[in-house]
Amino acid sequence: EYSCECISYQGRHHVLAVTKKYTTGYPHFIETGHMEPPELSEIEMNRVKEFIPKALTALEIENGASHSEFKLDADGNVRIIEIGSRMGGDCIGSHLVYLSSGYDFVRMVIETALGQEPELTPAHEPMCAGIRFVFTKKDLDVLEEIKSKSPELLQMVSEMEPVGEHQVVDSGSRFGYYILAGKNQAEIKDWLER
């Protein structure tokens, strides 16, 4: 599963980032992490960047943020799950878009709300960014390993609830999270998938 993060101004849509979603799978499909950019082929990325703006236009979304969740079918076609006229949650809009693309999504949302054209100049070179949510002690062990082996990747660590105090049954019951960013996508992916 993926999502596409866009800013729109006066009916013009700008794709800022595409996000891969990691989940627990059936039965709850709780998101365990996200990564930007995803490992999609150039053809698949182009399909996303072409299809999602058309969907936003069809829904008459003209100004502000959007978070479009989708899957790719076996032929690589975009299949929309839902479109929210908002930034992505779980630190996607607030942190990952900026880290991965250099675009200040929060600022853009404010600018468009004020009727101003958003600033579309990236503040830095693109990177790979990811967030890992804490479900078990294993997630904390991975965090400690990152601190000792690759501390430069660690961008943020949330406050943590004591792990194991309750069962994680939805996004609101996760124990915390940490955010990573760096130039090497394979390295970020490895830390997210351990």
Residue ranges and their predicted role:
Residues 28-29, 89, 168-173:
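Short, flexible turn/loop "capping" segments at secondary-structure junctions
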Residues 1-78, 87:
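Internal nucleotide-binding/catalytic subdomain
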